[in-house]
């Protein structure tokens, strides 16, 4: 059986010419030359979701904006990531994400390292055209470790995918459809798993938080040190957040 090597592909992104391997996702091709395309649902190593629509880009000869996280590069592709049409589309998506998002950044554990917060500053979506009353839902404690603040959730599905595809546990899923869709644990109102914390770590906002960390410190007050995980006998390397030590 012969191994067939795919030829490299030449594309242009924001006027920069680059050569990348065939089959590369456009979002990764942009990243390789320092062009950061925003995205909430995309995460390397996980299946493609295309849910948040924040990575929209303009591709020459295509009638509509395309999602960079699901588009594979093609020879001669000409891409624009920062034209006004793209920025306005991203701003509109942010307004929808913020429609029911609580304004609790000062007390949210993700404040200061929240990807939604960063994108709001970057695209100036601080003022919304929507005047509807926000739907408030009480926070839920799924386990001694995992807390879920539903109004903060932006339905990026990162937690569901990392739990299933990354950890092979499948303790998280979804319920309902459309605007009523939400993340749910495997036992309706509580979570039965090994409590590895991957869902908390991968959450781009403050929807999933740790019981040991909640409301105790701020991200910029922490320093990080390498250590060995004591969760089981495998001895995996991990990074520990430390304060006042």
What are these regions (language model features)?
Residues 3-5, 234:
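Short acidic, Pro/Gly- and aromatic-enriched capping/linker segments at domain boundaries
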Residues 53-192, 200-230, 234-238, 243-245:
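Fe-S ferredoxin-like electron-transfer domains
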Residues 9, 16-75, 84-89:
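N-terminal cofactor/phosphate-binding cores enriched in small/glycine residues
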Residues 14-16, 148-149:
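Extended, non-catalytic structural segments that build the interaction scaffolds
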Residues 20, 193-194:
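Ordered, soluble secondary-structure elements with a strong preference for glycine-centered loop motifs
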Residues 5-11:
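Short structural boundary motif marking the start of a folded domain
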